[in-house]
Every structure is written in structure tokens, then in C-alpha cells.
């Protein structure tokens, strides 16, 4: 009785825990027929039973709870019992055989790899503990019970009805090691799978990396700066522009057109000959001559041009020589500004305007 209580408690505790996982199997009822070994009936290795009383073959009843370890390998904890008559003893003599087993089974899927087949033959190997209780007949000098270790070997098949239910049939031989006798059982049951059968891992498919879609380069906005200088030289006491400098003034006008926000600072200078007042007016007149050329001939907005006369205050050469005085009679202009240009892919930005 104690053995059956342990087995029942183990299954009741394990069942709700196991049900949460795929591949858990429950066989709530195993029915079969056990054939008792004549060696046991005739006394076993120690002659514990007389040659007269015989254990009769009888109904096998059991239950099992298991788990699929792989798609082809499973393990089950099983409890079963056989209750039968003892012939040749006192009237009403009977025996009760109880077992608790741990069995591994391997299905044909190990070889065939046909995991969706409807019929799955299997082989079974396991071990456990058995106990016989006798009522109305003595077991020789050992009293009314015997127990020991057993080993199981069997063949069977799962007949799959659907993904959750299978009919199970099996032929099993049980070797009772302590008494050295065999029992043989033919059994059947309904096998229930909780959460679905285990499936083999899907093959890993290596997906080729997807090359990113090329993104067309976008146009870029760049800022171009303008830094330009102009030098115009004059004759003594003159403010008119010589023809040789007009192309240079035209270049300045062109850049002022290309850079709409550019401005020009125009400075007039003289040598040190003559009165200061005269040279102040002359230096400013020379600056205004360049400004007038830009405004009148090239339509440059006058507000973008500033002029100033410095007389002889900023010489760049020695006024004691003729050559030096010629260098000092000049206009010097600085033109500065910037513009934003859109550069297309593959196109180089224009180089900044060079100083003149």
C-alpha cells in the first residue's frame, strides 16, 4: 500500500508542473495481462513457495507520466499493479504485485527521421522496484511479502490518432533480479501529449546579407568667399583712368555682379608734391574716378562702393625718387564678399577669386 501511495503522490505533484511544457506525455490508464513465471511459481531461486500453490496470470493496470527528451527519445515514470489468485493454497488466497518503474523508450524516428509518421515502433528499457503481498498463503520462511529490484525490456508502437492522442501497444518482459524470475506483460493504453510533440530543430538558414540600396549623393550648398584687390596708377595731378587699367576695373565689376553682397572699399593716394589741400582733393577724386567707372559703365550699385582720399599719408614707395612718386600716385581697392553655391555630385566647387 505504501508503494502505491508514493507513486500516486509523485504523479499528482508532477502532472500540473509538467503540463506547462511541450512534449509532456500522460498515459492515465494502462491495461494488460501479466503472465507469471513458472520459476517463481515453483519456488524461485530459494524455493520460497511450495511446488503446490501457483500465482495465476491476471489483469495488469497502471498509469504513466513522461516527457519527450528529444523527438525520438522519451522517459516515463510508471506505476502498475496486478492482483490475482493463488491456486493450490487455502480458499480465497490471493496475491498483489506492485511496481514503480522508470523507463526510457526510443522510437523509430531515430532512424527514419519521419517525425510525422502515424505509426512509431519503439523499444523500451528501464528499471524499478517491485513488491508482492500474499494473503492466505505463506511465502516459505519469509512471511507474506517479498520485494526487490527489477529491469524492464520491451517493444511496442504508438499508433498516432492526432497530434495529441496516440494508442499505445506493448509487449514487455520484466526481470525480478533479487528472486531471479521473469514476468511477461501484454498491455495497451491511450497516450496523451500535453503541449504537442517535440519537433526537430528547424535547419538554420543563412540569409545572405541585403546590400543597402545605394543612396544618390545629394547636392551640397557651399559658401564661396571673395577677396580681391585692384591697383590703378595715375599721372601727376591727374585723376583720369588710363586705358591700360580699364580691363582690371572690368574684372572687379564682373566679380561684384557674381557676388551680389560684395562691397568695395576704394582708397585714393598722391605723392608729396603740391599743397596738402590739393592732394586731399586729388586723392579723393582718383577714388571717385574708379567708383564712377564701376557705376556708370557697369551699373554697379553705388551703395556698395565706398571711397576715401588719404593724400600723401600712406606712401608705399620713397617720394624722393621719381619712380617712388609714380608708385604713390594710385588707387587701391579691396573687394570682399561671399555667396552660396549649390555643388552637384561629382562637381568641384569653384576656387575662391584670386587677388588682383
Swiss-Prot record:
Disruption phenotype: Significant loss of the bacterial outer membrane, not as able to induce apoptosis as wild-type bacteria in human cell lines. Disulfide bonds: none annotated. One of its GO terms (biological process) is monoatomic ion transport. It holds the Pfam family OmpA. Residues 1-19 form the signal peptide. It is a multi-pass membrane protein. Keywords: Apoptosis, Cell outer membrane, Host mitochondrion, Ion transport, Membrane, Porin, Signal, Transmembrane, Transmembrane beta strand, Transport, Virulence. One of its GO terms (cellular component) is host cell mitochondrion. Meso-2,6-diaminopimelate binds at residues 237, 271, 273, 279, 286. GO terms for molecular function: porin activity. It is found in: Cell outer membrane; Host mitochondrion. Residues 221-339 form the OmpA-like domain. Homotrimer. Forms a pore with a size of 1.3 nm. The periplasmic domain (residues 221-339) binds peptidoglycan (PGN) and diaminopimelate, one of the components of PGN. Live A.baumannii and purified Omp38 elicit identical effects with respect to the induction of apoptosis in human cell lines. Functions as a porin. Induces apoptosis in human cell lines through caspase-dependent and AIF-dependent pathways. Purified Omp38 enters host cell and localizes to the mitochondria, which presumably leads to a release of proapoptotic molecules such as cytochrome c and AIF (apoptosis-inducing factor). Binds peptidoglycan, contributes to cell wall maintenance. Belongs to the outer membrane OOP (TC 1.B.6) superfamily. This is Outer membrane protein Omp38.
Amino acid at each position: 500500500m505504501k508503494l502505491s501511495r508514493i507513486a500516486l503522490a509523485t504523479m499528482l505533484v508532477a502532472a500540473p508542473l509538467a503540463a506547462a511544457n511541450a512534449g509532456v506525455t500522460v498515459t492515465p490508464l494502462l491495461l494488460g495481462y501479466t503472465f507469471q513465471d513458472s520459476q517463481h511459481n515453483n519456488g524461485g531461486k530459494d524455493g520460497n513457495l511450495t511446488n503446490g500453490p501457483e500465482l495465476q496470470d491476471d489483469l495488469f493496470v497502471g498509469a504513466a507520466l513522461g516527457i519527450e527528451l528529444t523527438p525520438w527519445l522519451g522517459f516515463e515514470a510508471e506505476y502498475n499493479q496486478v492482483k490475482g489468485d493463488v491456486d493450490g493454497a487455502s480458499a480465497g488466497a490471493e496475491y498483489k504485485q506492485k511496481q514503480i518503474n522508470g523507463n526510457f523508450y526510443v522510437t523509430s524516428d531515430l532512424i527514419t527521421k519521419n517525425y510525422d509518421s502515424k505509426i512509431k515502433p519503439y523499444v523500451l528499457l528501464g528499471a524499478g522496484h517491485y513488491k508482492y503481498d500474499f494473503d492466505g498463503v505463506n511465502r516459505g520462511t519469509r512471511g507474506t511479502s517479498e520485494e526487490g529490484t527489477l529491469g524492464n525490456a520491451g517493444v511496442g508502437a504508438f499508433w498516432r490518432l492526432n497530434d495529441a492522442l496516440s494508442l499505445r501497444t506493448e509487449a514487455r518482459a520484466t526481470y525480478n533480479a533479487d528472486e531471479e524470475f521473469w514476468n511477461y506483460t501484454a498491455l495497451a493504453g491511450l497516450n496523451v501529449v500535453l503541449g504537442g510533440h517535440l519537433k526537430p530543430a528547424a535547419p538554420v538558414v543563412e540569409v545572405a546579407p541585403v546590400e543597402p540600396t545605394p543612396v544618390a549623393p545629394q547636392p551640397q550648398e557651399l559658401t564661396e568667399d571673395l577677396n580681391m584687390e585692384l591697383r590703378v596708377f595715375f599721372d601727376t595731378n591727374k585723376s583720369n583712368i588710363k586705358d591700360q587699367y580699364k580691363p582690371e576695373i572690368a574684372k572687379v565689376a564682373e566679380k561684384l555682379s557674381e557676388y551680389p553682397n560684395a562691397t568695395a572699399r576704394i582708397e585714393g593716394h598722391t605723392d608729396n608734391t603740391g599743397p596738402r589741400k590739393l592732394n586731399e582733393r586729388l586723392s579723393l577724386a582718383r577714388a571717385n574716378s574708379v567708383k564712377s567707372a564701376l557705376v556708370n559703365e557697369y551699373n554697379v550699385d553705388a551703395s556698395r562702393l565706398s571711397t576715401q582720399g588719404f593724400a600723401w599719408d600712406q606712401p608705399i614707395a620713397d617720394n624722393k625718387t621719381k619712380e617712388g612718386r609714380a608708385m604713390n600716385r594710385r588707387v587701391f581697392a579691396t573687394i570682399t564678399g561671399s555667396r552660396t553655391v549649390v555643388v552637384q555630385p561629382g562637381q568641384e566647387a569653384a576656387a575662391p577669386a584670386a587677388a588682383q
